[in-house]
Curated annotation (Swiss-Prot):
Topology within the bilayer: Multi-pass membrane protein
Record PANTHER family: PROTOHEME IX FARNESYLTRANSFERASE, MITOCHONDRIAL
The reaction(s) this protein catalyses: heme b + (2E,6E)-farnesyl diphosphate + H2O = Fe(II)-heme o + diphosphate
Name of the protein this chain belongs to: Protoheme IX farnesyltransferase
Presence of keyword Transit peptide: no
Pfam families to which the protein is assigned, alphabetical: UbiA
Family (UniProt): Belongs to the UbiA prenyltransferase family. Protoheme IX farnesyltransferase subfamily.
EC id: 2.5.1.141
GO molecular function: protoheme IX farnesyltransferase activity
Alphabetical keyword list: Cell inner membrane, Cell membrane, Heme biosynthesis, Membrane, Transferase, Transmembrane, Transmembrane helix
Record organism: Yersinia pseudotuberculosis serotype O:1b (strain IP 31758)
Amino acid sequence: MIKQYLQVTKPGIIFGNLISVIGGFLLASKGDIDYPLFLSTLLGVSLVVASGCVFNNYIDRDIDKIMERTKNRVLVKGLIDPKVSLIYASVLGIAGMLLLYVAANALAMMLAVIGFVIYVGVYSLYMKRKSVYGTLIGSLSGAAPPVIGYCAVTGQFDTGALILLLIFSLWQMPHSYAIAIFRFKDYQAANIPVLPVIKGISVTKNHITLYILAFMVATLMLTLSGYAGYKYLVVAAAVSVWWLGMALRGYKATNDSVWARKLFVFSIIAITSLSVMMSVDFNVHSSAVLLTYAG
């Protein structure tokens, strides 16, 4: 039973988000790490992400049973009562948000709430099923964790937080489109209006290329604005150029599914590399404050 309650939270997604939280937190810490705050932030974000994933599993029960990769999920197979899953998700979410408020600050909690509402309320309940722009909306919630980590330290939404939001939002797009290409038949069968299904794979390749170019610019801004060092810059430039090269090779790909899967795998390598580098190669910087909270 414990295994099922763990599976429904999508541990892989939680782990991936924690890597970005660590990157944002350590970038803002600049070597002066508050370990109790660090652990509390990781736990708080984990609980909120887990809550969102459980709600998503509940909402998507009808389409999950159609898709090959999701047909064996816990709620689809009836291993957990749907009503119980709602209570479970609510408890996880409330606990995570309260922890962020108490241990970090109101801004970190507010960002978690915004990310949660976008993912569950806007994306999962409506945009995913109704609009080709669902991926774009979902990318905002996917970019929330590193910004939460950053703001848990600073207590303010400054230029650094905005750049992180841009980097991770832009990264989400080619990452998600790659999944939509190699899982094309699943999305088509479930009638989910992702870009490859609605506009075609050729158009999606153009979008992937443009988003990677924008991602490249955003990653460099972290150094150019004085938040990260030149070692980070070298790694950011290298992974961005390599990722762009992979995207361009897609125009000559004989098997779009194989190409998209490789692009997807490298997207994970790319964002993990950036998260690690911003954690260790930071600059002390006088930030431009965009939003702050005192209380």
